Regions:
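Conserved P-loop NTPase
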Residues: 1-2, 6, 114, 123, ...
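Walker A/P-loop NTP-binding active-site region of P-loop NTPases
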Residues: 18-83, 87, 257-319
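Short glycine-/polar-rich loops that comprise or flank the Walker A/P-loop
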Residues: 26, 53-56, 81, 161-162, ...
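P-loop NTPase motor core
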Residues: 29, 101-182, 186, 337-421, ...
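Short beta-alpha junctions and helix-cap segments that line functional grooves
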Residues: 46, 71-74, 169, 173-177, ...
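Conserved inter-motif catalytic segment of the P-loop NTP-binding fold
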Residues: 55-138, 294-372
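Conserved nucleotide-binding/hydrolysis micro-motifs of P-loop NTPases
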Residues: 63-67, 75, 89-93, 134-136, ...
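Flexible loop/N-cap segments at domain edges
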Residues: 249, 255-275, 280-282, 326-333, ...
Length: 481
């Protein structure tokens, strides 16, 4: 249990959510990370928000010039009006010229700490950023000396009405722990290079003395004029109990095959080879949901918006493509430019901001490429399915494969945690390739076990009769039931 403490918003709402309200007022916090992770950008965002609310803000730079800092702000389209920017040289030129090879580090470091404290006291700032502690560390003769000076600085700052953010570079020798233990809060920024596509950025709160926070890694992105943080999903924190709706396909034979309408909050996986009709079946459910007045979120990793909408016109009704009520929310996702956290955040926004009752992911194979390096597909998807279930949102996940369902391999492994499975296949009969469909699983009820013909016509989807040819003439033998 944590005592009531006053929080200071960072200017990044989602980061404040991770921090359970923001930084702790009148405390010293550390933002650390390797060069290029966005420490300066985050520090500027913190001060800009303070200045916008009328607070006195101070940026103390020990490494960059004022002009360089202003250029960084301009690159994001930001103005530093209302923010005092002061340069403090760790070693003044007149002092440096008088030094011998034996530097009196005790005097220099103590003087630097004193100058920092004096500048903050003089400004009367309520928000302070000090960039960067690397310059301070370089003046320390050893770790104990550095730690003593940091504690001295922290004690001096405690006399002021200021919430201070220190910026520091992570080092290979592990010396960042010296600073971590001396401050009240620590946020670590990390940038991971991928074999192809954009680098992935993520952050975590290491500690927040006296305050609660959401632990774990959270993806973030730096855009031209803002920083976006995507808090990791905790399904149990979300629930929506109103307006429970099952999802019918509006195709009687398809509903009968899968055992009725898809239950509200259930997850369904549609699997099959390329071109077998997976997306078309999913779009049929989307069309039915839109016609019933529900909002639908459709996330496409593979096909363009124009291709999907033309397919809706070709196989379904024109009304679905025009969608005058704007209930069909189609988003094209580039798997090489998005992080797992950002994708889940997009799903949440469709559900929470638009009130979507059906979410379709097409297809999961491309999403696998986004998170393959984490080796946590089942954990992340299970959390997403749990969240959607708690929000009474029905989900459909499309997975492409060319062989029999194999739950030991991706993406078929997802079938273990989904509630329903619809399988599509090709089969050859009398030198003609046909499409087949069957239901393999329904967790909350019974379903048909017949393999039936699937037709994609100008009028829409049609489910034919049970396929009566011998099994060895069908290219989809050994269906699981």
């Amino acid at each position: 249990m944590h005592l009531d403490i006053e929080r200071i918003p960072t200017g990044i709402p989602e980061l404040d959510a991770v921090l359970r309200g923001g930084l702790i007022r009148q405390r010293v916090h550390l933002i650390e990370g390797r060069p290029g992770t966005g420490k300066t950008t985050l520090g500027l965002r913190y001060l800009i928000h303070g200045a916008s609310t009328g607070q006195r803000c101070l940026y103390l730079t020990l490494s960059e010039s004022r002009e360089e800092l202003l250029a960084t702000a301009r690159s994001h389209g930001w103005s530093l009006d209302g923010i005092a920017v002061e340069e403090i040289m760790p070693l003044p030129p007149e002092t440096a010229s008088a030094q011998t090879i034996l530097l009196p580090t005790d005097t220099e470091l103590s003087a630097l700490v004193g100058r920092i404290a004096d500048q903050i006291a003089k400004s009367g700032a309520e928000r302070v950023v000090i960039d960067s502690m690397v310059e301070v560390r370089l003046l320390a003769r050893d770790s104990p000396h550095y730690r003593r000076q940091i504690i001295d600085l922290r004690q001096r700052l405690a006399r002021f009405d200021a919430t201070v953010v220190l910026l520091d570079d992570l080092t290979a020798d592990g010396r960042e722990y010296e600073l971590q233990s001396a401050v009240h809060g620590v946020v670590t920024l990390e940038q991971l290079e991928r074999s192809f596509g954009a680098a992935r950025r993520r952050l975590r709160v290491v500690k927040l003395r006296g305050g609660d926070f959401q632990s774990g890694w959270h993806d973030y992105a730096i855009q031209k004029n803002e920083i976006l943080v995507f808090p990791s999903l905790i399904a149990q924190e979300h629930r929506r109990d109103d307006d429970v709706r099952d999802m019918s396909s509006n195709v009687e034979s398809l509903d009968r095959l899968v055992g009725g309408a898809l239950s509200a909050g259930s997850s369904t996986m549609i699997v099959g080879p390329s071109g077998s009709g997976k997306s078309t079946v999913a779009l049929q459910y989307a069309l039915a949901a839109v016609e019933s007045g529900c909002h639908v979120g459709y996330f496409s990793f593979d096909e363009s918006e124009s291709t999907l909408r033309s397919r809706m016109v070709e196989h379904m009704h024109q009304d679905a493509a025009t969608d005058e009520q704007r209930r069909f929310h189609l988003q094209r996702i580039n798997p090489s430019r998005i992080s797992p956290g950002e994708f889940i955040w997009k799903v949440r926004r469709i559900v929470e901001d638009r009130g979507a009752r059906l979410v379709i992911i097409d297809c999961i194979n491309s999403y696998l490429d986004v998170i393959r390096e984490e080796k946590s597909l089942l954990l992340q998807m299970n959390e997403l399915f749990s969240y959607l279930s708690n929000m009474n949102v029905t989900s459909i996940i499309i997975g492409a494969h060319s062989a029999r369902l194999d739950t030991s391999k991706e993406p078929d492994a997802l079938s273990i945690i989904t509630d329903n499975i619809i399988s599509l296949r090709y089969y050859e009969h009398e030198n003609v390739v046909h499409k087949a469909i069957c239901a393999l699983k329904r967790r909350d009820g019974r379903h048909e076990h017949d393999v039936r013909e699937l037709y994609l016509t100008d009028a829409g989807i049609e489910i034919g009769e049970r396929i009566a040819v011998p099994v060895d003439e069908i290219g989809v033998a050994n269906f699981d039931s």
